[in-house]
Swiss-Prot record:
<feature type="active site" description="Nucleophile">
    <location>
        <position position="136"/>
    </location>
</feature>
<dbReference type="InterPro" id="IPR018215">
    <property type="entry name" value="ClpP_Ser_AS"/>
</dbReference>
<feature type="active site">
    <location>
        <position position="161"/>
    </location>
</feature>
<keyword id="KW-0645">Protease</keyword>
<keyword id="KW-0720">Serine protease</keyword>
<dbReference type="GO" id="GO:0004252">
    <property type="term" value="F:serine-type endopeptidase activity"/>
</dbReference>
<dbReference type="GO" id="GO:0009368">
    <property type="term" value="C:endopeptidase Clp complex"/>
</dbReference>
<dbReference type="InterPro" id="IPR001907">
    <property type="entry name" value="ClpP"/>
</dbReference>
<dbReference type="GO" id="GO:0051117">
    <property type="term" value="F:ATPase binding"/>
</dbReference>
<comment type="subunit">
    <text>Fourteen ClpP subunits assemble into 2 heptameric rings which stack back to back to give a disk-like structure with a central cavity, resembling the structure of eukaryotic proteasomes.</text>
</comment>
<keyword id="KW-0963">Cytoplasm</keyword>
<dbReference type="Pfam" id="PF00574">
    <property type="entry name" value="CLP_protease"/>
</dbReference>
<dbReference type="GO" id="GO:0006515">
    <property type="term" value="P:protein quality control for misfolded or incompletely synthesized proteins"/>
</dbReference>
<comment type="similarity">
    <text>Belongs to the peptidase S14 family.</text>
</comment>
<protein>
    <recommendedName>
        <fullName>ATP-dependent Clp protease proteolytic subunit 1</fullName>
        <ecNumber>3.4.21.92</ecNumber>
    </recommendedName>
</protein>
<keyword id="KW-0378">Hydrolase</keyword>
<dbReference type="InterPro" id="IPR029045">
    <property type="entry name" value="ClpP/crotonase-like_dom_sf"/>
</dbReference>
């Protein structure tokens, strides 16, 4: 009997490994799993095309309309996704605008600069639209859209602040290297925001010394966006 139970347990563990079903996992494995979230499950829908029926999700449908949705933290993975989409859309039609919707808490400075450089590199104009929030690194991406094509919804907000060091420990020489790199990144951020907003570098320097939150009208006045829209035009 014990051997049968052992066989069943082993089979259940193998099945859990294949399916990733928490209920099939041993207690030790379940304890190691992240807590469940209430994330909304993105539905898929079926659309009729000249080539037959096609099933896709909302993000794929938006991409067909040349819309990129940045709705997560800015990190290496999301940066790669955004850059790949920008390059594909340029190759499909270099003369049509790309639209980037942003609702992001920010994230990695290096990942953000990779997206920024790609936005400046490609030929199509990049329209940026802030829904919800564009914080930290995401605020730079919002401001770096094509001038005159940077939009924001009325209840969205922007946060700008200075970059921070991921690690503040190590050998003295390593800390010195990190500090120099942080100062270099801060100088780049100040100059880039000044370039895209028209603000004086000294004002940018003062404003990012602490967390500075901007409402949609304030972001427009600051020069981060060009228009605040309540309805699609």
């Amino acid at each position: 009997m014990a051997s049968e139970e052992a066989k069943f347990a082993a089979r259940a563990d193998r099945l859990a490994g294949r399916q990733g079903v928490a209920g099939f996992m041993p207690a030790s494995a379940r304890a190691a799993q992240p807590a469940p979230t209430n994330r909304y499950i993105m539905p898929q829908f079926v659309e009729k095309t000249p080539y037959g029926m096609k099933t896709q999700d909302a993000y794929s449908r938006l991409f067909e309309d040349r819309i990129i949705f940045l709705g997560v933290q800015v990190d290496d993975a999301s940066a790669d996704d955004v850059m790949a989409q920008l390059l594909v859309l340029e190759s499909q039609d270099p003369n049509r605008d790309v639209m980037m919707y942003i609702n992001s808490p920010g994230g990695s400075m290096t990942a953000m600069t990779a997206i920024y450089d790609t936005m400046q590199y490609i030929k199509p104009d990049v329209q940026t639209v802030c829904l919800g929030q564009a914080a930290s690194a995401a605020a730079i991406l919002l401001a770096s859209g094509t001038k005159g094509k940077r939009l924001m919804l009325p209840n969205a907000r922007v946060l700008i602040h200075q970059p921070a060091i991921d690690q503040g420990f190590g050998k003295a020489t390593e800390i010195e290297i990190q500090a120099k790199e942080m100062l270099r990144m801060r100088e780049w951020l100040e100059e880039t925001l000044a370039k895209h907003t028209g603000q004086d570098v000294e004002k940018i320097r003062r404003d990012i010394e602490v967390d500075t939150f901007l409402t949609a009208p304030e972001a427009k006045e600051y020069g981060i966006v060009d228009e605040v829209l309540e309805h699609r035009q």
